[in-house]
Design a protein with these regions (language model features):
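Conserved catalytic submotifs in the C-terminal HATPase_c
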Residues: 137-140, 159, 164-173
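Short helix N-cap motif at coil->helix boundaries in the Bergerat
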Residues: 143, 224-235
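PAS-family sensory/regulatory modules and their coupling/dimerization elements
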Residues: 1-58
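Short helix-loop "hinge" at the ATP-lid/N-box region of the Bergerat-fold HATPase_c
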Residues: 193-194
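Short alpha-helical segment of the dimerization/phosphotransfer core of two-component systems
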Residues: 111-116
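Conserved micro-motifs of the catalytic ATP-binding
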Residues: 131-136, 174-178
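Conserved glycine-rich
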Residues: 265-266
Length: 287
């Protein structure tokens, strides 16, 4: 408190010298720190001060989010861009006479171009969620009907890996939520399960409902996630060493899932054991 009073006195002294002045102050609160903007003006006629205090915590939070986003983009985009540039220069130089080697370079360029495209799409979606402040458009929908639409859109991915899907979602579950966000959440989680599942394995979908919430479980038979990495899988751009070595991806899908789930008033969690697969749980309010 003394520190804050000193800051205010310093501001008023500066105001006396310049007629007006501004200063920022951070106050420790129980839930989170508060960023305040103090604006002071001298009233010459009465020799008094007018002090206006504005809470700019949300503004500072948005600024920090944008800084982090730009930092993430500049860091993560370097790798695919470097591969595309180096591969293109090598091909254009005519140094590769072997067709098979040239084909590998071309495939690498294509893969990294696709990764770059996916990354930009996911980043734009994340930015829209974090900065738009849009209110979810909640309407009644049948959960099974929406999940069946998602499964149909992922059939080609499952066919490539000969993956079976056991869908035990009840046809009676009806909730009020944002349909587009719901589809994005479940599509990302099911696609993620397909990506990290071995060929010929099974993915299971289950649901349970309470008086207020619905919980959807997506279980795979993949390698699993190390215990020390469980609390990081929803971080932006985070991918485990195992994932980086064996699968393509941007590291943004689960971060997008978390942002959308939180936006709908729910949460997402994961349980996993090495060599026993992973289970993701999405809890959403019924209304």
């Amino acid at each position: 408190a003394n520190k804050q009073l000193q800051s205010i006195n310093k501001l008023l002294k500066k105001t006396k010298e310049n007629l007006s002045a501004e200063a920022e102050m951070t106050i420790k609160a129980k839930s989170s720190d508060k960023n305040l903007l103090l604006s002071a003006t001298t009233m010459l006629s009465t020799n008094e001060y007018i002090l206006v205090i504005n809470d700019i915590s949300s503004l500072r939070k948005l600024e920090n989010l944008r800084k982090n986003l730009l930092s993430d983009i500049s860091h993560e985009i370097k790798t695919p861009v470097s591969v595309i540039r180096a591969g293109s220069e090598t091909l254009n130089s005519g140094a590769l006479e072997d067709k098979e080697t040239a084909k590998k370079f071309t495939q690498s360029i294509q893969d990294n171009a696709e990764r770059l495209s996916e990354m930009i799409e996911d980043l734009l979606e994340l930015e829209k969620i974090e900065f738009s402040g849009l209110v979810p458009n909640k309407k009644k929908m049948n959960v099974l009907q929406q999940i069946n639409i998602i499964i149909d859109s992922l059939q080609s991915l499952m066919f490539e890996k000969n993956i079976q899907l056991n869908n035990s979602i009840s046809s009676e579950h009806v909730i009020k939520t944002d349909k587009d966000s719901f589809r994005t959440i479940l599509s990302n989680l099911i696609a993620n399960a397909i990506k990290y599942s071995p060929d010929g394995s099974t993915i299971s979908l289950k649901s349970s409902i309470s008086e207020t919430d619905i919980t959807i479980e997506i279980a795979d038979e993949g390698y699993g996630i190390e215990k020390q990495n469980l609390n990081r899988v929803f971080d932006r751009f985070y991918r485990t060493d195992k994932a980086r070595a064996h699968t393509k991806g941007t590291g943004l899908g689960l971060s997008l899932v978390k942002q959308l789930t939180n936006r709908l008033g729910g949460n997402v969690s994961v349980e996993s054991k090495i060599n026993k697969g992973s289970k993701f749980f999405v809890r959403l309010p019924q209304k």
